[in-house]
From Swiss-Prot:
The lineage of its organism: Eukaryota, Viridiplantae, Streptophyta, Embryophyta, Tracheophyta. Signal peptide: none annotated. Its EC number is 2.4.1.-. The gene is UGT76E9. It is an enzyme of class 2 (transferase). InterPro entries: UDP_glucos_trans. This is UDP-glycosyltransferase 76E9.
Length: 453
């Protein structure tokens, strides 16, 4: 990464209050800071980031709002986003106005632009009022954005009927979105389709934005990126995988248990399946027990992340679960793990994931094949692409049974099919690595972005 340069100007960033959105936003912030820009992060009380020695060069400001702290949990992400955007539109204008007053006497502190998470679309109106350049940042991929846009158009023509009618129609392919089925569209598990579409209408509206940054790679999504360019008619900058472009301080909700690395050090190469279903996924007790039984039957080693409170209606501890499995030498269970370190470890041969975009990029960036068990929104799009387009994993659908778990694990860690996926995953890893090096597509895209700011 380049040395820090003389400060150019200041960029204001607005992350969405979710771990999967904060991490790439801070990676983007670090990349821009290393290119010479001063950074201001505008956030609500729902964000997890706090000023620290790792972020000493960043300015943090709080967008005042009066939503109860319980809203994020009680409303669910979709209804919460709708309410948060309405609440923050006026207060962010005041916030931005005060920031401009503070900086106007310092020429080098002039605000170059406002970069906002696509789901924090209230920022567009405020930046427009002060005639500041606006840039949308998508922490998800280009295909997911295309799906959200398509859903808005389909909804207007009652084209989402297969999602509502059931009777097997959800298995039908969506026109012009091959290989995606209606069931793969990024609907939310927390709200009806109508509410999701309401969010998508605003998040997919470029408004007066002058550009869009996406945490993706050209070699992964060339057709979706071309579609996006034609649809939005503004410059699109695919600069990912951002975790390979710049490091950022940890933004984990939970403390990472690094003892699992010591355990991995004792395992054979490519012998362990790493299981982590992200920071939101909730499981029924029955599903956890079926997974445990399937892992036992597979006769393979596993590192399993089970967050506190992620098993519905159960007080079963990780220690109790491992004891019930009666295979203490073959498994290790932690509350949270340093995922990048885990995926980079030579002992890890497969990743059972919810397929959040950050996790998917991190897995592909290390050449690790995936077992996909998506839960909500873009995870379903990502899982379908992992299996059918990039062909570096398999998707587990339907009811979770021990036999299904056992077969999926063996497919990746034991069968010849898994070896073929591993080779494709390693090839993809090299392509991603090249993309962020000088001359690579993402490196060049970042340079092009910098020239416009």
């Amino acid at each position: 990464m380049e040395e820090k340069q003389e400060r150019r100007r200041r960029i204001v960033l607005i992350p969405a209050p979710a771990q999967g959105h904060i991490s790439p936003m801070m990676q983007l912030a670090r990349a821009l800071h290393l290119k010479g820009f001063s950074i201001t992060v505008a956030q609500t009380k729902f964000n997890y980031l706090k000023p620290s020695k790792d972020l000493a060069d960043f300015q943090f400001i709080t967008i005042p709002e009066s939503l109860p702290a319980s809203d994020l949990k009680n409303l669910g992400p979709v209804w919460f986003l709708l309410k948060l955007n309405k609440e923050c539109e006026f207060s962010f204008k005041e916030c931005l106005g005060q920031l401009l007053l503070q900086k106007q006497l310092i020429p080098e502190e002039e605000i170059a632009c406002v970069i906002y998470d696509e789901f924090m679309y209230f920022a567009e109106a405020a930046a427009k009022e002060f005639n500041l350049p606006k840039v949308i940042f998508s922490t998800e991929n280009a295909t997911a954005f295309a799906c959200r846009s398509a859903m808005c158009k389909l909804y207007a023509k009652d084209g989402l009927a297969p999602l509502k009618e059931g009777c097997g129609r959800e298995e039908e392919l969506v026109p012009k979105l091959h290989p995606l089925r209606y069931k793969d569209l990024p609907t939310s598990a927390f709200a009806p389709v109508e509410a999701s579409v309401e969010v998508f209408k605003s998040s997919c509206d470029k408004g007066t934005a002058s550009a869009m940054i996406i945490n993706t790679v050209r070699c992964l999504e060339i057709s979706s990126l071309e579609w996006l360019q034609q649809e939005l008619k503004i410059p699109i900058y695919p600069i990912g995988p951002l975790h390979m472009v710049s490091s950022a301080p940890p933004t984990s909700l939970l403390d990472e248990n690094e003892s699992c690395i010591d355990w991995l050090n004792k395992q054979k190469p490519s012998s362990v399946i790493y299981i982590s279903l992200g920071s939101f996924t909730l499981l029924e007790t029955k599903e956890v027990l079926e997974m445990a039984s399937g892992l036992v039957s597979s006769n393979q080693h596993f590192l399993w992340v089970i967050r506190p409170g992620s098993i519905l209606g159960s007080e079963l501890t990780n220690e109790e679960l491992l004891s019930m499995m009666e295979i203490p030498d073959r498994g290790y269970i932690v509350k949270w793990a340093p995922q990048k370190q885990v995926l980079a470890h030579s002992a890890v041969g497969a990743f059972w994931s919810h397929c959040g975009w950050n996790s998917t990029l991190e897995s592909m960036g290390e050449g690790v094949p995936m077992i996909c068990r998506p839960f909500t929104t873009d995870q379903k799009v990502n899982a379908r692409y992992v299996e059918c387009v990039w062909r570096v994993g398999v998707q587990v659908e339907g009811e979770l049974k021990r036999g299904v778990v056992e077969r999926a694990v063996k497919r990746l860690l034991v069968d010849e099919e898994g070896e073929e996926m591993k080779l494709r995953a390693l090839s993809l890893k090299e392509k991603l690595k090249v993309s962020v090096l000088p001359g690579g597509s993402s490196h060049s895209s970042l340079d092009d972005l910098i020239k416009t700011l």
